[in-house]
Swiss-Prot record:
Cellular component per GO, a single term: cytosol
Catalytic activity, EC: 5.3.1.9
Function noted in UniProt: Catalyzes the reversible isomerization of glucose-6-phosphate to fructose-6-phosphate.
Record field: catalytic activity: alpha-D-glucose 6-phosphate = beta-D-fructose 6-phosphate
Record protein name field: Glucose-6-phosphate isomerase
Subcellular location: Cytoplasm
Keyword field: Cytoplasm, Gluconeogenesis, Glycolysis, Isomerase
Major site of localization recorded for this protein: cytoplasm
Entries under HAMAP family matching the protein: G6P_isomerase (MF_00473)
Amino acid sequence: MSAYARALDALRQHRRETEDFDLRQAFGADPDRFSRCSAALDDMLLDYSKCAVSDETLALLDKIAEAAGVIERREEMFSAKRINVTENRAVLHTALRNDSTRPVMLDGKDVMPDVEAVLAAMSTFSEGIRSGTIKAATGKSFTDVVNIGIGGSDLGPAMATLALAPYHDGPRLHYVSNVDGAHIHDTLKALDPDTTLFIIASKTFTTIETMTNAGTARSWIAEKLGQDAVGSHFAAVSTALDKVAAFGIDESRVFGFWDWVGGRYSLWSAIGLPIMIAIGPENFRRFLDGAELMDRHFREAPSRENLPMMLGLIGFWHRVICGYPARAVIPYDQRLARLPAYLQQLDMESNGKRVTFEGESVTVPTGPLVWGEPGTNGQHAFFQLLHQGTDIIPVEFMIAARGHEPELKHHHDLLIANCLAQSEALMKGRTLQEAKAQLLAKGMSEAEADKLAPHRVFPGNRPSVTIIYEKLDPFTLGRLIALYEHRVFVEAALFRINAFDQWGVELGKELATELLPVVEGKKDASGRDSSTAGLVAQIAALRDS
C-alpha cells in the first residue's frame, strides 16, 4: 500500500471515529479555537474554526499532503517544470505578476522581458484610449470598450472590472461572450459606433463564439462608419497574427500571451487589457502586486500559516473525507457578484477530472460543484437549503471591514452583521428545545409550540470558512484571486490530477460543428440518435410554422 493510500485510510478512519464532532461543544471547550484555527496574511484573515476539524485532523491532512507531494509539485510549478502533462506545457501564470527583477527561466530563457514588454505595450495603449490620444475613425475619443471573448477571456476580466468599479476612471466597459445573438444585440443597441472600441480576445482567433460575435461587431462598424474604419475601432489579444491581420486589425494593436498561460488563469496577461483600460496601468500593477504577494506567501509560509494550503486542505477534507458534493461561495459584496461564476470555472474546469496525471482512474471524488451569489441576496434565495436541507454544503463567506461608501456606513455595518450571523447560525443551529422555548416566549400555547417547533429547528454543525480583509481594492482583489488559484492547485495535487487541461470541453464543441449544417437544413440527421434527430426535427417544424 502506498503512503498516499495509507494516509487516505487514516483520514477515513479518523472521520468514522469523529462523526459526532460537535462545533458548539468544540467552541465551548476551547476558548482559543478561533485563534488556533485561523491564519492571516497581513489584513487578510482566513477563519476555518467553524469546520469540524481538530489538531489530529490537521495532522492527518498534513500527512496526505506530504504523501501526495504537494510541496514538490508546488516547486515544480514555480520552477517552470511541464506539470501540464497532457499538453506538455509549463504552468507559469505566476510569472505574469512576478517581480521583474527575479528571472523566471523556461527552457533556458528568462520569460520576464517578454512579460514586461507586453505589459508596457498594454500600458501605452490603455493610456492612449483613456486620455483620448488614440482616437476613433471619426476623430472622437472612445467612450465605450466592448470585450468580446468567452471562458477565461471573459469571466476573469468581467469579474475584476465589476469588482473594481470604484477605481474606474476610464471608458465604460462591456463584455460580450455568448454566441446567442441577444447578447451582442442588446449590447450594441445602447452604444454609439462613433465612440466604441472592440477588443477581440482569442488566443487562436478561431473560437467559434468569439469570432461569430467579432464578425457581427465588424459588420456593425463597417455599416455605420465604413469598412476603412474597422482598423481604428478594433484591437486584439491573440497570438495568431495572420488571422488578426486578415480580420483587419493592425499588428500594433495586437497583444500576445503564451501557451504556458491557461485561459482561466489569464486575466493577469494581455487578457486583462480591458481591466487596465478601466482602472489604469498603475492600479493594474497594484492588482498584479497583490497576486505576487500571495504567490510568495504560498511558497514560503508554513502550512498552518499558509492561506492557500489551509483552504485546500479543508476543501479536500470536505469533498473527499466528508463526502460533501458542493461548496457555496458567498461574497458579501455586490461588486463581487461575478466572483462565484469566475471561481466556478477556475475550480470546476481545473478539478472536474476522473483520471490521475498518470492516466489511471482516480480513487477519490474530485472537484465539487461550486456555486454562489452575493450576500445578502442569497439569504433570500437558497440559504433555506443551506440551513435546513438534507445535504450539507460548506459555505465560504468573504467580507471587507470597510466599504467604499463611508456616507453609507450603516449599510456596510448591516452587511457585516448578516455575514457573521449566517456563519454563526450554520455552526450553532437551534435545537428543538430552543425553538419551542422561543415560541412559548412569544405567547404561543404549548400545543401550538409543539406543532410548530420542529419546523423551526436548525441542525447546525454545518461548516463554513470566512475570509475577511480591510477593503476590496486592486491589491486585495489580486491576493484573493491568487489565493483561490493556489487553493485549486493544492486540491488538484491531493486528488492527484492535472488541473491545467480541460479536455472535457472538447467533445461538445466537436459535435456542435457536426450538427450546425443539420440545424441549418443543409444535411439530414441520419446516423444520429433518435433524441437528437427528434429535437432537430421539432425545431425545424417550429421554425416553419
